[in-house]
């Protein structure tokens, strides 16, 4: 499956930038989730790659093919990009059966493909099965009801699965009535003669039949622009129905299926044309919580079995964390971080990423700090309490601040240079500093809070709830402000001075509101952010 490369991709409407100068490489066979808040540009990115939305500028490459380039004037239509799209609503035809819904798109495909002699191919396959009929006989005998009568529908499904044949070939095989023990030598001879006649016919016309019954000339397949045959369509439908496990529903209508079953049909329909890339736009949003969890496992399995490249849009960070091989986190059309899920969780690039990923949300504490000679950072937190932060890797704050200021100046220089370009359109939806939330007992309206003058001493501590441990040996005193036990864990709100911390406590311990406790921060995953 192909790699996808996006270069300087931008989409704007007037001064509103939905996607702002995005550079992204999606590896072959990756499962990438586009994650971010509503309106951040996730679906727009997906639609641009698929060809459903025309970018304002930039370049898109799928595999070794440029499908969009604003400078070269290239824009390959969506139906020529070999991609599949799965939407939030299943978009199934209510007047068609499951089989017809999956086959409908296949019946509309018309493109250049090898010429195949399916009559000869099916005759050869039938002769092969008839020469060793024991397996087919065993299958047929397994399909008898308690009265010994053969269940035709069940037998056809089993024959299709066992021999990977179409329903048309399976019916021919069924009609031989192998379970009756009849001599098949005459039928085998007739089938062999049919294959030989086809070989001779092609040979007389200057062609040959390959082992897969493709018509060849000079050792190369003969190509022709054609539609798929009913045999090819049926084989594709049977293949994908087996993958998503809906073979028993093929004769039902969408109204007769549950939400999860309808979603499986939509997935099968998308997979049937064998797209190079599969795009999914919040496909699980309409399902209940239990079914959504089950479908996540199904999508994981589907990704492995198909070997396809998956690009998945969601605002649910739990879906992103559990499904993705890489998370692409977007905010206001700008890429925030593109890493494997655990790196995004444990090593967020900025405060926005730390706040968005994680449930319950990360705890933020404002602090004043200065670096000591040994490299540690002495902090003042809460209402004047002292703490020491020891970086996991050696860090010189003065050097880091100098590099930060230099990068900010460089960005400003580049921006001023862009303003001189007459074709440049200034961004109306400005990129503003993320306003993180500090949980306090007396909540104030953060919109009314004045922005203070910040110095290099101003920092923000980030602590994940699972790294706050309630322990009698803890050095911080607190009070239980609220508790939500869920069985294997409890989410506890703890009051320390006027601040509220969220902790996750594993086990079945019960907490009472107002209870005095002690706590401490554990592990090496406490984060320190530059407040400026």
Give the location of each predicted region.
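Helix-to-loop junction immediately C-terminal to a conserved catalytic motif
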Residues: 50
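Short coil-to-helix segment of the ABC ATPase nucleotide-binding domain corresponding to the Q-loop/switch region
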Residues: 96-105, 114-119
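The feature captures the beta-strand-to-loop junction immediately N-terminal to the Walker
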Residues: 35-37
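Non-catalytic connector elements of ABC transporters
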Residues: 161, 171, 373-532
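ABC ATPase nucleotide-binding domains
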Residues: 100-104, 108, 212, 223-352
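Conserved ABC transporter NBD signature motif
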Residues: 58-70, 119-131
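ABC ATPase NBD coupling module
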Residues: 67-84, 108-115, 127, 139-153, ...
């Amino acid at each position: 499956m192909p790699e996808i490369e996006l270069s300087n991709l931008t989409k704007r409407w007037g001064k509103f930038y939905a996607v702002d100068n995005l550079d992204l490489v999606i590896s072959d066979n990756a499962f990438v989730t586009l994650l971010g808040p509503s309106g951040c540009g996730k679906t727009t990115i997906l639609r641009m790659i698929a060809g459903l939305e025309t970018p304002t500028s930039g370049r898109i490459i799928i595999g070794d093919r440029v499908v969009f380039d604003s400078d070269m004037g290239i824009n390959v239509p969506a139906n020529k990009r070999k991609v599949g799209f799965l939407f939030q609503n299943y978009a199934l035809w209510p007047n068609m059966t499951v089989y017809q819904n999956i086959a409908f798109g296949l019946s509309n495909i018309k493109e250049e493909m090898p010429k195949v002699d399916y009559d000869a191919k099916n005759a050869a396959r039938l002769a092969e099965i008839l020469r060793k009929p024991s397996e087919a006989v065993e299958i047929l005998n397994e399909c008898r009801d308690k009265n010994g009568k053969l269940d035709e529908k069940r037998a056809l499904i089993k024959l299709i699965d066992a021999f990977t044949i179409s329903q048309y070939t399976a019916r021919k095989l069924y009609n031989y009535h192998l379970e009756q023990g009849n001599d098949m030598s005459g039928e085998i001879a007739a089938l062999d003669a049919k294959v030989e006649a086809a070989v001779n016919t092609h040979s007389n016309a200057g062609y040959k039949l390959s082992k897969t019954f493709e018509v060849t000339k000079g050792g190369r397949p003969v190509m022709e622009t054609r539609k798929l045959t009913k045999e090819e369509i049926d084989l594709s439908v049977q293949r994908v129905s087996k993958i998503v496990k809906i073979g028993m529903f093929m004769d039902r209508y969408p109204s007769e299926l549950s939400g999860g079953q309808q979603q499986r049909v939509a997935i099968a329909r998308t997979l049937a044309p064998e797209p190079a890339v599969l795009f999914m736009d919040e496909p699980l949003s309409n399902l209940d919580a239990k079914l959504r969890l089950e479908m996540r496992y199904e999508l994981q399995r589907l990704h492995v079995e198909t070997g396809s490249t998956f690009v998945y849009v969601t605002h649910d960070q739990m879906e992103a964390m559990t499904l993705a091989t890489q998370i692409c986190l977007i905010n206001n059309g700008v890429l925030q971080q593109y890493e494997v899920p655990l790196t995004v969780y444990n090593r967020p690039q900025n405060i926005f990423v730390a706040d968005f990923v994680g449930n319950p949300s990360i705890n933020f504490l404002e602090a004043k700090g200065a670096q000591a000679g040994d490299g540690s950072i002495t902090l003042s937190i809460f209402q004047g309490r002292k703490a020491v932060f020891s970086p996991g890797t050696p860090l010189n704050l003065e050097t880091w601040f100098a590099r930060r200021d230099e990068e900010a100046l460089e960005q400003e220089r580049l921006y001023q240079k862009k303003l001189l370009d007459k074709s440049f359109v200034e961004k109306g939806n400005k990129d503003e500093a993320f306003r993180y939330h500090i949980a306090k007992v007396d909540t104030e309206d953060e919109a009314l809070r004045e922005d203070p003058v910040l110095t290099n001493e101003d920092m923000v501590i980030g602590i994940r709830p699972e790294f706050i441990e309630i322990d009698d040996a803890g050095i911080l005193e607190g009070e239980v402000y609220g508790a939500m036990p869920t069985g294997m864990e409890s989410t506890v709100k703890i009051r320390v001075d006027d601040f509220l911390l969220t902790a996750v406590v594993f086990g079945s311990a019960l907490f009472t509101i107002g209870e005095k406790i002690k706590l401490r921060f554990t592990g090496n995953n406490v984060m320190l952010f530059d407040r400026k």
